[in-house]
């Protein structure tokens, strides 16, 4: 079974890869619910792995998203690993690894400098102390680590927007974005 990306998904993949090639700053893809974020993740992971030969860690907040993202990646025909106690698998054998935060955090020694990219699904909910610890740990082994987030809601209650600049480069006022993790919203896919 294969898949075909919709034009807006393909554009998101191209824009994300351009961003990842140009900077080590964290970038964010905002895409409405049902926009096919799992397929976007799969295509980015497949292409970056093919370009670099290095490992990619895809982090999601729960087993259900882990299974959904892994199933979409399976459509690429490329092998992948799961690293999640809730999925009964803790492997980093293949270049693309789908993991849950707690399982990865509890075995950070399994994640080395060979990881060039962390993709955060549900980035608005994923920016927890555990995720930040994972990023810091892998970045200490690979200072060129890239981080890419995907979300349908780039706003976190109590903190505001999770990015510093919108897709047009306009800075988000400090009162609307308290210490945002992502440097820029690099893609915006609206439901309209």
Tell what function each PLM region has:
Residues 1-30:
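Conserved pre-motif I regulatory segment
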Residues 73-110:
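Inter-Walker segment of RecA-like/P-loop motor cores
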Residues 54-55, 93-96, 115-117, 143-148:
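Loop/turn-to-beta-strand initiation segments
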Residues 96-136:
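Conserved RecA-like ASCE ATPase "motif II neighborhood" in helicase/translocase motors
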Residues 124-192:
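Post-DEXD/H (motif II) to motif III coupling segment of the RecA-like Helicase ATP-binding lobe
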């Amino acid at each position: 079974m294969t898949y075909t990306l919709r034009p807006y998904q393909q554009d998101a993949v191209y824009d994300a890869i351009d961003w990842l090639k140009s900077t080590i700053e964290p970038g964010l893809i905002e895409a409405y619910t049902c926009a096919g974020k799992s397929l976007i993740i799969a295509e980015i992971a497949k292409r970056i792995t093919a370009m670099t030969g290095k490992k990619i860690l895809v982090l999601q907040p729960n087993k259900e998203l882990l299974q959904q993202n892994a199933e979409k990646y399976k459509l690429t025909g490329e092998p992948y690993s799961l690293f999640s106690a809730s999925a009964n698998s803790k492997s980093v054998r293949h270049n693309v690894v789908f993991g849950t935060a707690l399982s990865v955090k509890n075995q950070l020694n399994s994640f080395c400098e060979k990881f060039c990219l962390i993709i955060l699904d549900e980035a608005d909910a994923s920016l927890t102390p555990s995720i930040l610890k994972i990023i810091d740990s892998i970045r200490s082994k690979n200072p060129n680590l890239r981080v890419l987030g995907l979300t349908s809601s780039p706003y976190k209650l109590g903190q505001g927007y999770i990015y510093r600049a919108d897709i047009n480069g306009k800075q988000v006022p400090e009162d609307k974005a308290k210490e945002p993790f992502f440097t820029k919203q690099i893609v915006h896919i609206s439901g309209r």
